[in-house]
Design a protein with these regions (language model features):
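Switch/communication elements of ASCE P-loop NTPase nucleotide-binding domains
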Residues: 1-56, 238-364
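Phosphate-coordinating catalytic segments in nucleotide- and nucleic-acid-processing enzymes
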Residues: 48-264, 268, 336-356, 361-364
Length: 364
């Protein structure tokens, strides 16, 4: 599990250290303080792939839907200063460290443009690059480059990394994959199709999912794929099955999150703006589910990070973690902008009720 992170020169983080992560981590703070950016920084190193280049492009190409080009590349660096390299260092619970450094390498074309000289044809064909250096316990695992260029508009296209050799990553084993669920997950049905297939191919998982859907709405009896690979739900007193699109954002968000826990072998799950689309009455249900998934994880090392800007969600969280006796494994990290720096403030789950009574500002 992730114990701590230090982020330098990444997006709005000039230099921020956050220590003491636990099993359930809630990230709060004001607008544009970096809650989502924190999840992305963690995902670069503890993500879907062992390869940070792949994790970063997953964020830009598939989650943010703003492919990594010159403008979006600049926004990755604090203050748009591409001369300073990005560094993200994560400490795991076994005291191992993962250290990622990202450096911008301007193409000759870019250098010529900045000098206001007309570039040659050869220079215009050379893309700028991001150089990735990954270290584990201060030992360099690999050094790779990612070209900053348009990606073809074709389904299933994957970026190719210049020097990627899977054998280099053996030193990162055992690798524990992660899942990131974006704030607009209700509109990303395509991202849960794979998870749903795995669940619906397993009778026991299918039964569990149907029970969880029935807890959300007791009129829902089951979910399945039709012959056109669309998700359809069987609803009480309605003859024909209804498409998932006929339901509200709350059910879609709930299904996306629950299916990620059930289907993936991920040990780290990041959920951005967890309350989006959910009625307050279903926030409690979702939190109970999340804590049950953490408690029932056979290896005991499932870790969850959630961002929220909802006071109501935090109040419900306080109720659920006390009900589930999970307060000592819950922390709230409030990010606050202080001049150039983002400063974290830690609040402990067992003291949330006390913070409320004293009208503590848990949102920066």
């Amino acid at each position: 599990m992730i114990q701590s992170v230090r982020i330098k020169n990444f997006k709005n983080f000039k230099d921020t250290q956050i220590d003491g992560f636990t099993k359930l981590n809630i990230i709060t703070g004001g607008n544009n303080v970096g809650k989502s950016n924190l999840l992305e920084a963690l995902y670069c190193l503890v993500g879907k792939s062992m390869h940070p280049c792949a994790n970063l492009t997953e964020i830009y190409d598939n989650i943010r839907k703003e492919p990594l080009k010159t403008e979006s590349k600049n926004l990755m660096f604090y203050g748009l200063d591409t001369k300073e390299e990005i560094q993200i260092v994560i400490t795991l619970d076994n005291n191992q460290t993962l250290d990622l450094q990202i450096k911008f390498i301007a193409s000759e074309d870019q250098k010529v443009i900045e000098s206001q000289i007309i570039p040659t044809a050869e220079q215009t064909q050379m893309p700028s690059q991001l150089n990735f250096t990954l270290k584990k316990n201060n030992e360099e695992i690999y050094n790779d480059h990612l070209n900053i260029a348009e990606i073809p508009n074709q389904l299933g296209y994957k970026r190719q990394f210049k020097n990627f050799d899977p054998n280099q990553l053996q030193k990162l084993l055992p690798f524990e994959s992660a899942v990131i669920i974006p704030s607009d997950a209700a509109y990303r049905q395509v991202y849960m199709i794979q998870a749903m297939r795995k669940i619906l191919d397993d009778n026991q998982l299918e039964k569990e999912l149907n029970e969880r859907l029935n807890q959300f709405d007791n009129n829902i009896q089951s979910i399945s794929f039709n012959t056109n690979n669309q998700l359809k739900l069987k609803v009480k007193n309605i003859k024909e099955k209804l498409p998932l699109s006929a339901f509200g954002d709350g059910l879609k968000k709930y299904l996306h999150i629950v299916s990620a826990f059930m289907a993936d072998n991920a040990k780290t799950i990041y959920i951005d703006e967890v309350e989006n689309g959910l009625h307050f009455s279903r926030m409690k249900l979702l939190l109970r589910c999340v804590i049950d998934f953490i408690n029932n994880n056979k290896d005991g090392n499932l870790q969850v990070f959630m961002t929220t800007h909802s006071q109501e969600f935090i109040e419900i969280l306080d109720q659920v973690i006390r009900e589930k006796d999970f307060a000592h494994q819950t922390k709230l990290f409030c990010l606050k902008q202080d001049d150039q720096y983002v400063i974290p403030r830690t609040y402990y789950g067992e003291n949330l009720e006390y913070y409320f009574e004293n009208e503590e500002n848990l949102f920066g």
